[in-house]
Amino acid sequence: MIRIGHGFDVHALGEARPLIIGGVKVPYHTGFIAHSDGDVVLHALTDALLGAVALGDIGKLFPDTDMQFKDIDSRILLREAFRRVKEKGYAVGNVDVTIIAQAPKMRPYIDAMRAVIAEDLQCGIDQVNVKATTTEKLGFTGRSEGIATEAVVLLVKA
């Protein structure tokens, strides 16, 4: 049996904090405005995992009203979601992530993001794809006001 999950996340840019995307620190003059570290890639992926096994979403499991998740490393959230996926008897078939951002440029960091995700999801790097695109300077991402991400995951019965 296979299951497919889809996730989406967006955060505004504007805080004086590190910009963490896909578990990787990306040099930039500003970071995400968020309750956690704001990692849009890992948040979208966490939602995709949870959705694939009908466990709700990131806000249900890790509400932004709970101070224990304030400034938390999103890798912790991803690993916990994946632990629950494994409890249901599934493993990752593959992951496909699309980052939507005008700036900063993601290409130099994509291989590191893939490695982080593969490690956290206990799969091969060849099962993880991360790509980035722009909106050709249209909308909030085009004005570099925020970054959005979509993620799709295919789970297979372990």
From Swiss-Prot:
The keyword Ubl conjugation does not apply. Coiled coil: none annotated. The record marks H35, T134 as: Transition state stabilizer. Binds 1 divalent metal cation per subunit. It holds the Pfam family YgbB. PROSITE patterns: ISPF. It comes from the Bacteria. A divalent metal cation binds at D9, H11, H43. It is an enzyme of class 4 (lyase). 4-CDP-2-C-methyl-D-erythritol 2-phosphate binds at residues 9-11, 35-36, 57-59, 62-66, 133-136, 140, 143. InterPro entries: MECDP_synthase, MECDP_synthase_CS, MECDP_synthase_sf. It catalyses: 4-CDP-2-C-methyl-D-erythritol 2-phosphate = 2-C-methyl-D-erythritol 2,4-cyclic diphosphate + CMP. GO terms for molecular function: 2-C-methyl-D-erythritol 2,4-cyclodiphosphate synthase activity; metal ion binding. Transmembrane segments: none annotated. Its EC number is 4.6.1.12. Its cofactor is a divalent metal cation. HAMAP family: IspF (MF_00107). Homotrimer. Involved in the biosynthesis of isopentenyl diphosphate (IPP) and dimethylallyl diphosphate (DMAPP), two major building blocks of isoprenoid compounds. Catalyzes the conversion of 4-diphosphocytidyl-2-C-methyl-D-erythritol 2-phosphate (CDP-ME2P) to 2-C-methyl-D-erythritol 2,4-cyclodiphosphate (ME-CPP) with a corresponding release of cytidine 5-monophosphate (CMP). Belongs to the IspF family. NCBIfam families: ispF. This is 2-C-methyl-D-erythritol 2,4-cyclodiphosphate synthase. The gene is ispF.
